[in-house]
From Swiss-Prot:
It is found in: Cytoplasm. Pfam families: tRNA-synt_2e. SUPFAM superfamilies: Class II aaRS and biotin synthetases. InterPro entries: aa-tRNA-synth_II/BPL/LPL, Gly-tRNA-synth_heterodimer, Gly-tRNA_ligase_asu. GO terms for biological process: glycyl-tRNA aminoacylation. GO terms for cellular component: cytosol. Its EC number is 6.1.1.14. Tetramer of two alpha and two beta subunits. This is Glycine--tRNA ligase alpha subunit. Belongs to the class-II aminoacyl-tRNA synthetase family. GO terms for molecular function: ATP binding; catalytic activity, acting on a protein; glycine-tRNA ligase activity; transferase activity. HAMAP family: Gly_tRNA_synth_alpha. It comes from the Bacteria.
Amino acid sequence: MTKKMSMQDIILNLQEYWAEQGANLMQAYDNEVGAGTQSPYTFLRANGPEPWNAAYVQPSRRPADGRYGHNPNRLFQHHQFQVVMKPSPENIQELYLGSLTRLGLKASEHDIRFVEDNWENPSMGAAGIGWEVWLDGMEVTQFTYFQQVGSIEVDSVTAEITYGLERLASYIQDVLSVYDLEWGNGVMYGDIFKEPEYEHSVYSFDQSDEKMLLENFDQYEAEAKRLTKLGLVHPAYDYILKLSHIFNLLDARGAVSVTERAGYMHRIRSMARAIAREFITARAKLGFPLLKDSKLREKYIGEKGIYTKKLAKKIKKEA
């Protein structure tokens, strides 16, 4: 057992720190996602004017990055620690540096750089200005201010901080391979994840059923559209996440051409936009219950509020 902070310790310290800063500790979302951003705790909640602070670990699946467990740093599944704060605090960068200090990484003792790297997720219609955070030459975090989510301009800027837990732990424990990381209590990362990594790589590159996946894509898209029309936001969003994962599996398998790839991404993006709009509408109908500021409530749902007008138009259109 190493005396250095285990991956489990890193997670516990980050959870404790961000809870102290007002974040709600959520659990990993129980669906296939390619990044913490795709969790509804980020993607959906970044829409609309309501404040929202959350932190959670999110296992993230990226089929094309699998390497059968042979590469020390490229993985089918890695873990992100996701923090979202909306509206973004003015001192968010200082808060982030404070989280590194909690992990024993003081800014005065390390070369910590914010390297401009504006971020975009084309298939989900999400984008923002941002930075990669480099710790002594290694990228450990992506820092983003959302400008658009679901192809919709945001009402309130969300700050997103995404820690790459394997990278951060590799630096802290000073190991070259993620499989040599201590997860916790003397149990190694490789003991838990190396076999699944190999098996998922075999499936993604060699054994996935292309015909079935293509059929599933069409079926899940149709179901997402049906559920969206019914106003069932969260079940519909689950199917959009499944669409995204199936597309990633098809892409890893080499089953889609460059032209087809753009078409599939457009279909996912269209659904993401539709569900983002439906989520905002649903929250507006509820009166944006998390929005407590009286001036902001007047701005968005007062007699002449932005969403009061939008809801009136929607009701008139549906009548």
